[in-house]
A protein has these predicted regions:
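Positively charged n-region of N-terminal signal peptides that target proteins for export
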Residues: 1-4, 8
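Short, flexible, surface-exposed loop segments at domain boundaries
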Residues: 2, 22-203
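Bacterial N-terminal signal peptides
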Residues: 9-22
Length: 203
């Protein structure tokens, strides 16, 4: 998958309280990608690895839409999340980046392993510096106990968040879900990120 809450204007309250631990838990679960069907209160989803999973919507689930943004939207002092791959020269190259609204500043702050690809990492941090180049930008990302420089290629998908609600969670929707396994072994979705206008959440 946090320390801040999403603004009431987004209709997403209390995100910080739930998601800090869930991000780590989500890395051990299949990333969830497409809503297949709805069986009563259960959403049947197809994970990236092809597995079919049954997810219950938590009573206090946080729902947000994901829309396309651009590299030029990432500016100094933006708070972003960047999935990156290690490079032969020891640097990091972004696979994707998502721009958090101001009210989500601090969400999942840090640098840690991620499950998008083997050896991929996630860095959620403040943009300290942006250096532009013909083929992309290099971001200096500063978080509570360190910093990373990550090159963002011009073709890396960039997205941001918009308000969402339960009506967005429907068959065919492309999603990223932070799901937690309950004591009974069933999965409960606490944070739902739904692609809008043909966008696939790239995290």
């Amino acid at each position: 998958m946090f320390r801040r809450t999403l603004a009431r204007s987004l209709g997403i309250i209390g995100l910080a309280a739930i998601l800090a631990a869930q991000l780590a838990q989500a890395q051990d679960s299949p990333p969830i990608r497409v809503i297949e069907r709805v069986d009563g209160a259960i959403y049947v989803v197809r994970a990236r690895d092809g597995a079919e999973l049954k997810i219950a919507l938590a009573d206090n689930a946080q729902i947000a839409g994901i829309i396309k943004a651009s590299l030029s939207d990432i500016k100094q002092n933006s708070f972003v999340g960047v999935t990156a791959m290690p490079q032969p020269d020891g640097g990091l190259s972004a696979v994707e980046a998502h721009i958090f609204p101001e009210a989500m500043r601090g969400t999942g702050e840090g640098h840690y392993p991620w499950d998008l690809r083997p050896q991929s990492t996630m860095t959620n941090a403040n943009v300290e510096q942006v250096v532009s180049a013909v083929d992309g930008r290099t971001l200096t990302l500063k978080y509570k106990d360190g910093e990373k420089k990550i090159t963002v290629p011009a073709n890396a998908p960039i997205v941001t968040y918009v308000p969402g609600d339960k009506s967005d969670i429907k068959p065919g929707a492309k999603v990223f879900i932070v799901a937690v396994k309950q004591a009974n072994g069933k999965l409960q979705g606490r944070a739902w990120r739904i692609g809008r206008d043909g966008v696939t959440p790239p995290m």
